Amino acid sequence: MAPNTSRKQKVIKTLTVDVSSPTENGVFDPASYSKYLIDHIKVDGAVGNLGNAIEVTEDGSIVTVVSSAKFSGKYLKYLTKKYLKKNQLRDWIRFVSIRQNQYKLVFYQVTPEDADEEEDDE
């Protein structure tokens, strides 16, 4: 009996990152972020080898990554954290998953109780 040689179709995966919250405050540049992703995404073990496999687009406050190659949300989170650390924003902004393949950059919540405790210590 002949082996099954049918190939699986390439699945196109779309990941979206909503960067509206930090962009409105003027601390985040979506164009710079999308350029960073283009420059640092690895395809087949090589940086800058996007070709037709991965497309990064920026539309206002939404950055979209469309991939027909292997690309995970964890890798996008890793690259985003590296970008935030490089631009010294990691202490104020975090990368949060909203739904499957949809992410958002939000500010850390500072509770008023923490601020009161700091004032009491002094």
Curated annotation (Swiss-Prot):
<comment type="similarity">
    <text>Belongs to the eukaryotic ribosomal protein eL22 family.</text>
</comment>
<dbReference type="GO" id="GO:0003735">
    <property type="term" value="F:structural constituent of ribosome"/>
</dbReference>
<protein>
    <recommendedName>
        <fullName>Large ribosomal subunit protein eL22B</fullName>
    </recommendedName>
</protein>
<dbReference type="GO" id="GO:0005829">
    <property type="term" value="C:cytosol"/>
</dbReference>
<dbReference type="GO" id="GO:0022625">
    <property type="term" value="C:cytosolic large ribosomal subunit"/>
</dbReference>
<comment type="function">
    <text>Component of the ribosome, a large ribonucleoprotein complex responsible for the synthesis of proteins in the cell. The small ribosomal subunit (SSU) binds messenger RNAs (mRNAs) and translates the encoded message by selecting cognate aminoacyl-transfer RNA (tRNA) molecules. The large subunit (LSU) contains the ribosomal catalytic site termed the peptidyl transferase center (PTC), which catalyzes the formation of peptide bonds, thereby polymerizing the amino acids delivered by tRNAs into a polypeptide chain.</text>
</comment>
<dbReference type="Pfam" id="PF01776">
    <property type="entry name" value="Ribosomal_L22e"/>
</dbReference>
<keyword id="KW-0689">Ribosomal protein</keyword>
<keyword id="KW-0687">Ribonucleoprotein</keyword>
<dbReference type="InterPro" id="IPR038526">
    <property type="entry name" value="Ribosomal_eL22_sf"/>
</dbReference>
<comment type="subunit">
    <text>Component of the large ribosomal subunit (LSU). Mature yeast ribosomes consist of a small (40S) and a large (60S) subunit. The 40S small subunit contains 1 molecule of ribosomal RNA (18S rRNA) and 33 different proteins (encoded by 57 genes). The large 60S subunit contains 3 rRNA molecules (25S, 5.8S and 5S rRNA) and 46 different proteins (encoded by 81 genes).</text>
</comment>
<dbReference type="GO" id="GO:0002181">
    <property type="term" value="P:cytoplasmic translation"/>
</dbReference>
<dbReference type="InterPro" id="IPR002671">
    <property type="entry name" value="Ribosomal_eL22"/>
</dbReference>
<dbReference type="GO" id="GO:0003723">
    <property type="term" value="F:RNA binding"/>
</dbReference>
<keyword id="KW-0963">Cytoplasm</keyword>
